[in-house]
Amino acid sequence: MSNMQQKTDVILIGAGIMSATLGSLLKELAPEWEIKVFEKLASAGEESSNEWNNAGTGHSALCELNYTSEKADGSIDISKAVKVNEQFQLSRQFWAYLVKSKLIRNPQDFIMPLPHMSLVQGEKNVEFLKNRFEALSKNPLFQGMEFSDAPETLKRWLPLIMEGRTSNEPMAATKIDSGTDVNFGALTRMLFDYLKTKNVELNYKHSVENIKRTKNGLWEVKVHDMNSGKIEHHTAKFVFIGGGGGSLPLLQKTGIPESKHIGGFPVSGLFMVCKNQKVVEQHHAKVYGKAKVGAPPMSVPHLDTRYIDNKKALLFGPFAGFSPKFLKTGSNLDLIGSVKPNNVLTMLAAGVKEMGLTKYLIQQVMLSHEKRMEELREFIPNAKSEDWDIVVAGQRVQVIKDTDAGGKGTLQFGTEVVSAADGSIAALLGASPGASTAVHVMLEVLEKCFPSRMVEWEEKIKEMIPSYGISLTENPRLFQDLHTSTGRTLGLNEKETVHN
C-alpha cells in the first residue's frame, strides 16, 4: 500500500476527545461523509484525554476562582465564568442526546455528580469569595450555591480538610451540588466505539508525518503505519488536527498563513494520589483553592474526589513540571523543533516577558516529596507522607502568539481553533478549559469550516444541543428545563440525592 493515494471526505488526526466529538457531530449532520482517524498510539484517549492525564473536572466555573477576576473597585467580573458555564452546558446537552439516542450507554461510566467547592483562607480572600458568591448567585446558571465562613459548617462540608486545623485564620467556602467529575478517557473510548459502528475508519499506531496542499486544493496527509512500517498517502477535502500538544508541529507543516507567528510552551503536570482508601472515603468534593500571588492560572491547587474505573480516588495538585516534549509520549526535540523563522521573535519575546513563569517552573521542578506534602497539608493538615504517591499527568502546550492587547509573544491560557481562510483545515491548540468545552469548540470548527452548511444543519444541531445559539443566562426557564432533563438522562439527579 506504500505511496498509494487514498481519498476520503474527512481526516481526523488524533483519537482524543476533540476528534471524537467532531466525528460524532459530523456523523449526525452528514452521515454519508467518509471519515478516517489516525492515531499514533495503540488506542483512543491515551494522551491528554486519558483519565490520569487531566483533572477530570467538568469545568463550569462553579469553583474555579481564576474564572472570576476582581476589578480595581473590588467588584467581581463574572463574564468569563458565565461563558465557561454556558459552554459546558452544550457538552452536557450533547452527551445527554447521545445517551437518549442509545448511541452511547452507561453514562455513570463517564460522568458522576460531585459537589464543586471553593476554599480560601485569610480575611482578604474571604471577602473576595463572599463578593464572588454574591455576584454569581444573581445568575441563574449558579443557583443553589451556598457560602459559609462558619467553622461548624466548614467541618460538616469538609471533614478531612478541617480535621487537625490549628490556625485561627478566617476561612470560607462555597458549595454547589450540581458539579460533576468527568472521565474524559472513558467518554472518548465510548465515542470512538460508536463511530466504529458508523463505518468511521479508525487507524491506531498510525503516525502523521506531513500535511500538504495538493494542486487540486485537497489536503494530502502522509502517514507512517507503525504496524507494517509502510508509508501511506491519504487525501481529504477537510482535515482536523486534534493531536493535543502535537497539533502545533503538524499545523506548522501545513504552511497556511494562519499557522505563522504562533509558538508553544510545554508545561507538564504532576498530581499526588492517595493510596489509603480510608482517607479517600473521608472526602467527597472537588475543592479549588486560590492561586498564590504571581503564580500562573494553571497552578490553582485543588483536592479532588475522582471516579476512575468505577472506583473512588483522591488527587491533589497540580504541581508543574518542565519537559521539552509536546506530548507525554513525545520527543525531547519537540520544543526546539517548533521554533521557526516566522515565530522565533514571538518565542523570544515570550521568554523575556514570562520570567515569572520560568522562575515558578524551576521552583516547582526542584520540589521534593516532603515539600509537596507541605503544600498538601495546607489542605489536609493531618496528611501522612506514606499515604501519597506522585502521578505524572499529561503535557499541556500553552499557545504563544502576538496580540493587540498583550503585544509580541503573549502567553495564552485558553483553547484556540486555528483554521485556513477557506475552512479546509483546522487545528485545536491550547489547554484549559479544554475537554469540558469540547462541544462548543467543535461547533466553532463547524462554523468556521462549513459556513455554507450551517443553515442546513441548524435544525439537527438544535435537536442535539437545544441551547445552541441561545444565552441560557437570559433564558433561565430554558436552563432549568435543560438542566433537569439532561441530569435525568445522564443519571445525575438521582445520584446527587444519594451522595448528598
Curated annotation (Swiss-Prot):
A Gene Ontology MF term for this entry?
L-malate dehydrogenase (quinone) activity
Q: By its UniProt entry, which InterPro entries does this protein fall under?
A: FAD/NAD-bd_sf (IPR036188), MQO (IPR006231)
Among Pfam families, the record links this protein to: Mqo
- Pathway it belongs to? Carbohydrate metabolism; tricarboxylic acid cycle; oxaloacetate from (S)-malate (quinone route): step 1/1
User: Which E.C. number(s) belong to this protein?
Assistant: 1.1.5.4
Keyword field contains DNA-binding: no
- Positions of disulphide bridges: none
Q: Which reaction does it catalyse?
A: (S)-malate + a quinone = a quinol + oxaloacetate
**GO biological process per UniProt:** tricarboxylic acid cycle
Q: What class of enzyme is it?
A: oxidoreductase
Give the record's keywords alphabetically.
FAD, Flavoprotein, Oxidoreductase, Tricarboxylic acid cycle
Give yes or no: UniProt keyword Oxidoreductase.
Answer: yes
Q: Which residues form a coiled coil?
A: none
Cofactor(s) recorded for this entry are: FAD
Q: Which family does it belong to?
A: Belongs to the MQO family.
Q: What HAMAP family does its record include? A: MQO
Question: What is the protein name stated in its UniProt record?
Answer: Probable malate:quinone oxidoreductase
Q: Lineage in the entry? A: Bacteria, Bacillati, Bacillota, Bacilli, Bacillales
